[in-house]
């Protein structure tokens, strides 16, 4: 099948082709009923139930493809968007739509644990290696100006920023850097490389983005997909808690489970009793159940939410 000839009139949706964001992106697509089969030898997959083509790209390239209108939607990290904004400038027409609540990490300045560097001021004039050349250059430009204004370093000193596309954390051990700036999720790779963080440049997570240059014909489908993804993300953050309680205790338990908007209260056949159904933040559900039990709620059930619409 000639894929190029099948892309006309389809919404193009860019997804990271591999790496730390890929599996979570696939889950979002499945949860949004975007059905596809990917040929591992191809970077384009046609969606079976919607006029959409998925384009699998390196996460670092997605902001450029979306921001220049080559694709219409995309998922990438906020770090990659910030880097692209500095690299491309005003030509990047991209809008951040939904924080997808995964891929959270920090872009951090890291130095050897065994060394004597404890602050970024000490790195002015030193060698820095990173995959985020523009972000790091902007960051250290501010550090330099501050250090020079305070008389900590000579005015002619300039920090050396070098780009590498991968294995950033090995740069100090190989003797080509005094510090690195890289993404830190769990910190295991950083510690295994004998590094420690001394400053955070930015925090980042995966986001859904769209081009500002989409045609009006695609807008209805764009809004459908955006709404689906937003609803799926909300569903992953909440569970539904159901319980029975006597009306005399209702004011107290409703403060425990106020719901996302408001709880649903249904009168039971047993006099004086009601059933309550309320959305609760998933990570807080154990504590909520404990409090309900301590305040005379009974028959407490927790139900998962597969999907929702905002």
From Swiss-Prot:
**Which InterPro entries did the record assign?**
ATP-PRT_HisG_long (IPR020621), ATP_PRibTrfase_cat (IPR013820), ATP_PRibTrfase_CS (IPR018198), ATP_PRibTrfase_HisG (IPR001348), HisG_C (IPR013115), N-reg_PII-like_a/b (IPR011322), N-reg_PII/ATP_PRibTrfase_C (IPR015867)
Location in the cell: Cytoplasm
Q: So what does this thing catalyse?
A: 1-(5-phospho-beta-D-ribosyl)-ATP + diphosphate = 5-phospho-alpha-D-ribose 1-diphosphate + ATP
The EC number(s) attached to this protein equal: 2.4.2.17
Pathway it works in: Amino-acid biosynthesis; L-histidine biosynthesis; L-histidine from 5-phospho-alpha-D-ribose 1-diphosphate: step 1/9
GO (cellular component) term, any one: cytosol
What Gene Ontology terms describe what this protein does at the molecular function level? ATP binding; ATP phosphoribosyltransferase activity; magnesium ion binding
Main localization (coarse): cytoplasm
Which domain of life does the UniProt lineage start with?
A: Eukaryota
Question: What Pfam families has UniProt attached to this entry?
Answer: HisG, HisG_C
- GO-annotated biological processes: L-histidine biosynthetic process
> What CDD domains does this protein map onto?
PBP2_HisGL2
Does Cytoplasm count among this protein's keywords? Answer: yes
Sorted keywords for this record are:
Amino-acid biosynthesis, ATP-binding, Cytoplasm, Glycosyltransferase, Histidine biosynthesis, Nucleotide-binding, Transferase
The record's Gene3D superfamilies line, in alphabetical order, gives: 3.30.70.120, Periplasmic binding protein-like II
Family of the protein in this entry: Belongs to the ATP phosphoribosyltransferase family.
Per its database record, what is this protein's job?
Catalyzes the condensation of ATP and 5-phosphoribose 1-diphosphate to form N'-(5'-phosphoribosyl)-ATP (PR-ATP). Has a crucial role in the pathway because the rate of histidine biosynthesis seems to be controlled primarily by regulation of HisG enzymatic activity.
Do you know which PANTHER family this protein is assigned to? ATP PHOSPHORIBOSYLTRANSFERASE, ATP PHOSPHORIBOSYLTRANSFERASE ATP-PRTASE
Under HAMAP family, the record lists: HisG_Long
NCBIfam families this protein is in? hisG, HisG_C-term
Return the protein name.
ATP phosphoribosyltransferase
Q: Show the taxonomic lineage.
A: Eukaryota, Fungi, Dikarya, Ascomycota, Taphrinomycotina
Gene this chain is encoded by: his1
């Amino acid at each position: 099948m000639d894929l190029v000839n099948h892309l006309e009139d389809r919404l193009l949706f860019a997804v990271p082709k591999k790496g730390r964001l890929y599996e979570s992106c696939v889950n979002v697509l499945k949860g949004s009923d975007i059905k596809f089969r990917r040929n591992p030898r191809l970077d384009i997959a046609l969606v079976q139930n919607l006029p959409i083509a998925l384009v699998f790209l390196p996460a670092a390239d997605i902001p450029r493809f979306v921001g220049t209108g080559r694709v219409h939607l995309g998922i990438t990290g906020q770090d990659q968007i910030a880097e692209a904004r500095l690299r491309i400038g005003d030509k990047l027409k991209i809008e951040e739509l939904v924080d997808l609540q995964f891929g959270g990490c920090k872009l951090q300045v890291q130095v050897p644990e065994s060394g004597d560097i404890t602050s970024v001021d000490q790195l002015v004039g030193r060698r820095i290696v990173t995959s985020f050349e523009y972000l790091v250059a902007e960051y250290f430009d501010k550090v330099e100006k501050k250090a020079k204004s305070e008389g900590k370093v000579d005015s002619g000193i300039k920090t050396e920023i070098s780009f590498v596309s991968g294995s950033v954390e090995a740069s100090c051990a190989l003797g080509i850097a005094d510090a690195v700036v890289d993404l830190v999720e769990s910190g295991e790779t950083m510690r295994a490389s004998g590094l420690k963080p001394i400053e955070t440049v930015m925090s980042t997570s995966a986001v859904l983005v769209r081009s500002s240059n989409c045609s009006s014909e695609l807008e209805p489908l764009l809004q459908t997909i955006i709404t689906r993804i937003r609803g799926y993300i909300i569903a992953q953050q909440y569970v539904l808690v159901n319980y029975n309680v006597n009306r005399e205790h209702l004011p107290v338990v409703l403060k425990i489970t106020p719901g996302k908007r408001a709880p649903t209260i249904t009168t039971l056949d047993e006099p004086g009793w009601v059933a309550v159904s309320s959305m609760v933040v998933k990570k807080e559900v154990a504590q909520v159940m404990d409090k309900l039990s301590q305040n005379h709620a009974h028959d407490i059930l927790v139900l998962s939410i597969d999907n929702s619409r905002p």
